[in-house]
């Protein structure tokens, strides 16, 4: 057992009103109890609490924005270093994952379709399978994980973790249909026609947002979500300009350096990045450069033209100053300004409606405009964090269970 994990656990004050849990954790992980059990050598019990509360605990321990969540609210952090619960959570959940009892309730005879094997879909599938539903996961790609596999670099989240999830989910009786895209020749109504009682849509947000500037179709311009999917096929060259300042932009920058680019610069519209402090610091350590208060004007063959953003004396807001337009030479220009869902499902199933943001319209129960179809995750909210997807999916699983029990009871779907 790593000594630093034990040391971190010993630093926990076991607060009666834990800020880490109540204010910091989006899914209210019982951090003091987990730490207490860990210190008492009751690892499996600690892991069970983590998994019951967050089926993606292994993943979240690596990719969560801990410095702004649990660790950011730790009382020890007021005057010093917070307890690094991420290290404790990762050690427990990773060490015990294969030993957890994931037995399922007796079958209730009802089939559930889960469209999309990203964070939300995996969470829904695990929760409902354990309650006795026969779950089939439909995934466009060949392997599960969604944004976890195809949007987060290996150095942040090893893909082997997702392979372990796949094996455990198969052991639970969950079925998978890889390379199967709903919204083409097959729609959601076809699932209902085949006896599925409810369908969850968690297809993610894979359509890059455009900048809307001249030159965006040029051959040296790429989108972050596409690049992170398979960086090995890209030849970015030595000098890369990245537009956008979220965690994905940090991932792109650090990946580009690992693939041989020598001069990687992130251009930020404001005076600070949107990425987490940790991800920003890691990018700086890797050699990524940052230019603040810059906005892209247009893309040209030689690179991109940027202007300064200056403060408007009347409003105090930053505005573009085009008198400062400057050409920045770059071999590649990478656009990383978020994503929106694709619309193929909606084009096939006309009962599914989008809201003004271009994401699936749902009610306060997570049900879409199509009866029995629920949705959450990035397909509803746009690109968000993994833990936010898990938190929403947990509630949707409850609502789907309630919907099916009320409408069908224990009637078999056969």
Where are these predicted regions, by residue range?
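N-terminal Rossmann-like FAD-binding beta1-loop-alpha1 element of flavoenzymes
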Residues: 110-135, 250-257
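Glycine-rich dinucleotide-binding loop and its adjacent helix/turn
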Residues: 89-106, 164-184, 207-259, 354-369
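Rossmann-like dinucleotide-binding cores of NAD(P)H-dependent redox enzymes
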Residues: 134-137, 141-172, 176, 253-298, ...
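A conserved short coil-to-beta-strand element within the FAD-binding core of flavoproteins
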Residues: 178-190, 293-303, 310
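FAD-site-proximal beta/loop scaffold in flavoenzymes
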Residues: 217-237, 318-322, 328-383
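Ferredoxin-type iron-sulfur electron-transfer modules and their immediate structural context
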Residues: 1-111, 159, 196, 201-217, ...
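Residue-level detector of alpha-helix initiation sites
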Residues: 55, 118-119, 143, 246-248, ...
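AMP-binding/adenylate-forming core of the ANL superfamily
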Residues: 199, 303-305, 309, 325-335
């Amino acid at each position: 057992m790593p000594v630093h994990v034990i040391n971190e656990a010993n630093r926990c004050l076991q607060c009666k009103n834990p800020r880490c849990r109540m204010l910091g954790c989006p899914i209210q992980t019982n951090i003091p109890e987990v730490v207490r059990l860990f210190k008492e050598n009751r690892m499996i019990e600690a892991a069970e609490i983590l998994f019951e509360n967050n089926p993606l605990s292994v993943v979240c321990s690596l990719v969560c924005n801990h410095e702004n969540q649990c660790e950011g609210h730790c009382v020890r952090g007021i005057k010093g270093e917070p307890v690094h619960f991420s290290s404790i959570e990762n050690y427990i959940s990773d060490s015990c994952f294969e030993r957890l009892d994931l037995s399922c309730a007796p079958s209730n005879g009802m089939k559930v379709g889960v469209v999309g094997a990203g964070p939300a879909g995996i969470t829904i599938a695990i929760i409902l399978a354990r309650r006795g539903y026969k779950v089939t996961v439909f995934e466009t790609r060949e392997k599960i994980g969604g944004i976890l596999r195809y949007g987060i670099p290996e150095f942040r989240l090893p893909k082997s973790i997702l392979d372990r999830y796949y094996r455990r989910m198969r052991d639970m009786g969950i079925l998978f249909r890889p390379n199967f895209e709903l919204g083409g020749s097959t729609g959601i109504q076809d699932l209902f026609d085949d006896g599925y009682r409810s369908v969850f849509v968690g297809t993610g947000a894979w359509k890059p947002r455009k900048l809307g500037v001249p030159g965006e179709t040029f051959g040296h311009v790429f989108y972050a979500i596409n690049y992170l999917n398979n960086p090995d096929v890209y030849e970015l060259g030595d000098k890369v300009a990245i537009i956008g300042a979220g965690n994905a932009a940090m991932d792109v920058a650090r990946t580009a350096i690992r693939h041989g680019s020598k001069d990687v610069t992130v251009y930020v519209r404001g005076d600070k990045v949107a990425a987490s402090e940790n991800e920003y610091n890691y990018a700086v350590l890797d050699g990524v450069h940052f230019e603040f208060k810059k906005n892209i004007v247009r893309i040209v063959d030689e690179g991109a033209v940027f202007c300064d953003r200056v403060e408007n004396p009347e409003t105090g807001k930053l505005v573009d100053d085009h008198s400062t337009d400057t050409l920045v030479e770059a071999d590649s220009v990478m656009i990383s300004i978020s994503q929106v869902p694709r619309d193929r499902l909606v084009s096939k199933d006309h009962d599914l409606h989008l809201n003004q943001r271009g994401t699936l319209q749902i009610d306060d129960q997570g049900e879409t405009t199509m009866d029995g179809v629920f949705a959450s995750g990035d397909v509803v909210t746009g690109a968000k964090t993994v833990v936010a997807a898990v938190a929403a999916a947990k509630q949707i699983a409850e609502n789907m269970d309630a919907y099916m029990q009320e409408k069908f009871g224990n009637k078999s779907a056969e």
